[in-house]
């Protein structure tokens, strides 16, 4: 990269700046260290810094070069530090006849030493001394550092002599790594060269295994902290898996082991091919571009690519919308593909280290191998071997000789429980072009793949390796289209391909009985569908495969399933089942969470869709896996209870047992179960309590919660309290439950939800029940904020106290809500098109109003309040939150108990609700490019 490419003269003119400072010094009346002179020098340097950064940002916007920008910013800093240090040593604290001790080298270390910076990057400096520090040296260091700090820079520094550097590098791997990146800036160059030579001879030589092992362990620990997957939808560009630090780690390792200074030398050594070097440089350039834009856009050292800045970064990088994908999603897909490339490079370099050169270094193989190097054949043709519990290729040409071996490798690894040798994965990555239409249609390849997908062992692990190597996306091109695809919303925590793999992992865990407590029904049902278990694995792999297309992904996905299943070897009837499951994979979740399960019409309609018990079982398990694999905290016990209720109610219809008597019998059974748990209560009191809740309460609420509610209500009655709240944290589900007992009235739900919002509680779910004596028992789930249950319980009790104060008139709700009208920062990045549907076909008795919109504090209170103001009675409400989006369903009648059938009145209701929902959407673009949004 030439200076012409960098256009460094446009960043800062070193000679002009140096001359300006010297002229200021020559004409100054004050001492060079005086406060007035110091202010002049500082302002001159600050102006140059601001101008250089602005120029670097302008150039980045024009040429898009991330590496160019990082080098330009580094050059800017080099120039300012060089001139400042020169001023400090020749003007502020000059030495007429310096002794040997009064020499110093200023050295860039760490990230700054590597020669690239973003605007907010730390500046790590080493003031290198020949001996001990001197008074002159202390003055120079202090002057330089304070000037840099006053310029607003984050400067890390150390002042050491060479002996101290060597001793500390031997003891501390972080210091050793920082010195590995050391780069001379200014001062005594011979002093720096001495450090380089001694570092090479006394530290690096003979310690290669130790260093590499430490760096790989450090990388693994960093991944665990930042998130194991490289496909988190708000990735850390610097520290996350597949981010900049992974590239740094690779170069540290190769630099330490091969004694190279540049990546280009790795091609000459055979570690990387020219294509792989190009991949390395492209990944580095892209990550630098993203990181530099993030720092410029946020005016701080922002390393997390959060939802609220993704749209601006995508715009800066020039992404536009395509059919089915907005511009943010296209940008993030590119990001995740680059992260995947970084993973490929990691495997390639590890393979080269182990196989090409490491055998010449005593002890190196201990980094990778725990056991002796025993080999055994894994296949009759000798194409694969097991080497120290890892599968490897016996010859470099086995994939070219028979491309089916690219699938067979994974099949054998699964069957024998082997890890993958990096050499085998490297060879796979370099052979992807062999996967063509012939291989995709090969019956043997598809048979092997289906056995991998439906393996009784750990299919997710093998499929993950297939995906990481690129084989899965090439073998199933439709899957390749969703690799690294993110969905620009706060609900989905992972990319689409990562979600599908996690779905398969959940199913495998259910099948192995590992989720028996959390998912008892799924755990039971999986044992009854052995003949159809394969269909579930195929469905889970395919159910979101059509994401990112203009049409409904369920319908498009069903069409893809119809095409792929015969290729995998499924029969026509099996194909039909998978096609149906893919098309309906969202139905059970939607009905369970958004419909009244105590309404006969809900169950009848759902049963008409499902039609058979076999499909019902498959759909239930599919739904559980799908929800659970969305991300942490998405699944909770209440969703499980709703799904189980829907399953059991539908089972009665499909088996011919659905009747009011059956419901009554189940209600009776539930009341008897509760009576048994309350056996220590006096009979008269127990019977009176059991008559309070209506049937829907007993059919929806778990027995443990019923017992808890019973004691809660009993205690309130004994204390003579008509209004009381109770809090219960649920650590595993990342939610906290607040139960409210209060006299029922038309706007009660609106007041409760408003008070909750005013207290900072983000409502994610709610259950509403009334009792036969005119009281309401409402249970609200709010997002968890604290890690410990004690802290979270105290916080929830404060929320409960606010609810009590508002309901009792001690606090004024409108004033409280006015203080919390701003949506969360992340939510401000999104737009959800408001939608209101008024439907009289979903219930025989009620009109169902379904609203969809952008979540915001107090929205549920506003909705329920408006519905009450429209002279409607809410019989039940079903609140569902999908990240930034809410979908709420209200079962309503007019004040005399009739449906809302008048078209004019329906139009008025819809118009007012849409106005309320649209109030916060404003000009947000939901990730569409400005052109597309216009």
UniProtKB/Swiss-Prot annotation:
Residue ranges of every copy of the HD domain listed in the record: 496-613
Cross-referenced Pfam families: ACT, GlnD_UR_UTase, HD
Q: What is its EC number?
A: 2.7.7.59, 3.1.4.-
Q: Which GO terms describe its biological process?
A: regulation of nitrogen utilization
Signal peptide, first to last residue: none
Q: Which UniProt keywords apply?
A: Hydrolase, Magnesium, Multifunctional enzyme, Nucleotidyltransferase, Repeat, Transferase
The segments labelled Uridylyltransferase in the record are 1-379
Q: Which PROSITE patterns match?
A: ACT, HD
Q: What are the recorded GO MF terms, alphabetically?
A: [protein-PII] uridylyltransferase activity; phosphoric diester hydrolase activity
Q: For the region Uridylyl-removing, give the residue spans.
A: 380-736
Domain called ACT: residue spans: 737-818, 848-931
Q: What cofactor does its activity depend on? A: Mg(2+)
According to UniProt, the reaction catalysed is: [protein-PII]-L-tyrosine + UTP = [protein-PII]-uridylyl-L-tyrosine + diphosphate; [protein-PII]-uridylyl-L-tyrosine + H2O = [protein-PII]-L-tyrosine + UMP + H(+)
Q: What does this protein do?
A: Modifies, by uridylylation and deuridylylation, the PII regulatory proteins (GlnB and homologs), in response to the nitrogen status of the cell that GlnD senses through the glutamine level. Under low glutamine levels, catalyzes the conversion of the PII proteins and UTP to PII-UMP and PPi, while under higher glutamine levels, GlnD hydrolyzes PII-UMP to PII and UMP (deuridylylation). Thus, controls uridylylation state and activity of the PII proteins, and plays an important role in the regulation of nitrogen assimilation and metabolism.
The domain comment in this protein's record states: Has four distinct domains: an N-terminal nucleotidyltransferase (NT) domain responsible for UTase activity, a central HD domain that encodes UR activity, and two C-terminal ACT domains that seem to have a role in glutamine sensing.
Of which family is this protein a member?
Belongs to the GlnD family.
Protein name, UniProt field: Bifunctional uridylyltransferase/uridylyl-removing enzyme
């Amino acid at each position: 990269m030439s200076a012409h490419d960098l256009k460094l003269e446009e960043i800062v003119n070193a000679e002009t700046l140096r001359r300006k400072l010297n002229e200021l010094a020559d004409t100054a009346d004050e001492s060079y260290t005086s406060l007035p002179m110091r202010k002049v020098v500082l302002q001159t340097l600050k102006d140059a810094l601001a101008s250089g950064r602005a120029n670097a940002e302008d150039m980045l916007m024009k040429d898009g070069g991330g590496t160019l920008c990082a080098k330009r910013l580094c050059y800017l800093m080099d120039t300012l530090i060089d001139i400042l240090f020169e001023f400090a040593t020749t003007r502020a604290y000059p030495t007429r006849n310096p002794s040997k001790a009064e020499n110093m080298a200023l050295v860039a270390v760490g990230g700054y030493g590597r020669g690239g910076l973003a605007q907010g990057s730390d500046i790590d400096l080493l003031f290198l001394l020949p001996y001990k520090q001197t008074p002159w040296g202390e003055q120079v260091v202090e002057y330089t550092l304070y000037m840099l700090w006053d310029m607003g820079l984050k400067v890390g520094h150390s002042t050491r002599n060479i002996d101290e550097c060597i001793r500390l590098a031997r003891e501390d791997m972080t210091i050793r790594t920082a010195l590995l990146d050391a780069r001379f800036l200014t001062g005594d160059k011979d002093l720096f060269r001495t450090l380089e030579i001694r570092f090479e001879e006394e530290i690096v030589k003979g310690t290669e295994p130790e260093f590499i092992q430490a760096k790989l362990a450090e990388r693994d620990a960093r991944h665990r902290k930042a998130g194991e997957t490289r496909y988190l939808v708000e990735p850390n560009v610097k520290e996350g898996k597949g981010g900049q630090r992974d590239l740094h780690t690779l170069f540290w390792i190769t630099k330490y082991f091969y004694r190279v200074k540049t990546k280009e030398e790795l091609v000459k050594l055979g570690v990387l091919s020219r294509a792989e070097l190009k991949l390395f440089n492209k990944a580095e350039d892209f990550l630098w571009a993203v990181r530099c834009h993030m720092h410029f856009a946020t005016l701080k050292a922002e390393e997390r690519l959060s939802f609220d800045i993704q749209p601006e970064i995508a715009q800066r990088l020039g992404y536009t919308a395509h059919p089915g994908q907005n511009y943010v999603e296209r940008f993030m897909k590119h990001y995740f593909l680059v992260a995947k490339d970084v993973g490929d490079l990691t495997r390639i370099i590890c393979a080269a280290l182990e196989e090409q050169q490491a055998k010449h270094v005593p002890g190196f193989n201990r980094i990778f191998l725990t056991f002796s190097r025993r080999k055994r054949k894994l296949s009759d043709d000798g194409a694969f071997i097991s080497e120290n519990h890892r599968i490897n290729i016996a010859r470099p040409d086995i994939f070219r000789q028979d491309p089916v071996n690219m699938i067979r490798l994974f099949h054998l690894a699964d069957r024998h429980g082997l890890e993958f040798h990096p050499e085998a994965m490297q060879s796979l990555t370099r052979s992807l072009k062999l996967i063509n239409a012939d291989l995709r249609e090969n019956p043997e390849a598809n048979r092997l793949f289906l056995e991998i997908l439906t393996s009784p062992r750990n299919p997710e692990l093998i499929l993950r390796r297939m995906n990481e190597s690129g084989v899965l996306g090439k073998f199933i091109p439709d899957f390749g289209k969703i690799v690294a695809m993110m969905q620009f919303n706060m609900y989905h925590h992972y990319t689409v391909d990562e979600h599908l793999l996690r779905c398969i992992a959940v199913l495998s865990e259910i099948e192995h009985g590992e989720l028996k407590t959390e998912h008892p029904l799924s755990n039971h049902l999986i044992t009854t569908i052995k003949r159809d278990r394969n269909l579930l694995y195929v469905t889970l792999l395919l159910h979101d495969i059509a994401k990112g297309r203009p049409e409904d992904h369920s319908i498009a996905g069903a069409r893809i399933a119809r095409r792929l299943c015969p290729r995998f070897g499924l029969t026509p009837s099996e194909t039909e089942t998978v096609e149906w499951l893919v098309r309906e994979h969202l139905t059970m979740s939607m009905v369970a969470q958004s419909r009244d399960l105590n309404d006969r019409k809900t169950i009848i309609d759902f049963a008409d869709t499902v039609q058979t018990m076999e499909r019902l079982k498959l759909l239930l398990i599919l739904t559980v896996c799908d929800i659970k694999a969305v991300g942490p905290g998405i699944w909770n016990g209440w969703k499980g209870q709703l799904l189980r209720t829907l399953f059991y109610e539908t089972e009665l219809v499909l088996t011919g047992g659905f009747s009011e008597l059956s419901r009554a019998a189940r209600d009776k059974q539930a009341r008897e179960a509760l009576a048994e748990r309350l056996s220590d209560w006096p009979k008269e009191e127990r019977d009176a309590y059991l008559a309070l809740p209506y049937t829907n309460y007993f059919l929806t609420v778990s027995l443990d919660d019923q017992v808890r509610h019973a004691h809660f209500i009993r205690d309130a009655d004994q204390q003579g309290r008509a209004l009381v709240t109770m809090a219960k944290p649920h650590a595993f589900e990342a939610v906290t439950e607040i139960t409210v007992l209060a006299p029922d009235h038309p706007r009660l739900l609106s007041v409760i939800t408003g008070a909750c919002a005013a207290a900072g509680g983000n409502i994610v779910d709610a259950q509403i029940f009334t009792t036969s004596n005119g009281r309401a028992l409402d249970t609200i789930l709010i997002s968890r904020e604290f890690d410990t249950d004690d802290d979270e319980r105290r916080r929830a009790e404060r929320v409960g106290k606010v609810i009590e104060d508002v309901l009792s008139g001690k606090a004024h709700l409108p004033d409280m809500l006015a203080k919390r009208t701003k949506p969360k920062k992340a939510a401000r990045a999104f737009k959800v098109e408001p939608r209101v549907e008024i439907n009289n076909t979903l219930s025989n008795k009620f009109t169902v109003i379904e609203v969809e919109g952008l979540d915001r504090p107090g929205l549920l209170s506003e909705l329920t309040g408006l519905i009450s103001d429209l002279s409607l009675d809410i019989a039940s409400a079903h609140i569902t939150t999908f990240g930034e989006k809410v979908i709420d369903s209200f079962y309503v009648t007019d004040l005399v108990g009739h449906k809302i059938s008048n078209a004019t009145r329906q139009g008025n209701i819809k118009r007012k609700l849409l106005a309320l929902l649209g109030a916060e959407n404003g000009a947000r673009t939901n990730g569409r490019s400005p052109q597309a949004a216009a």
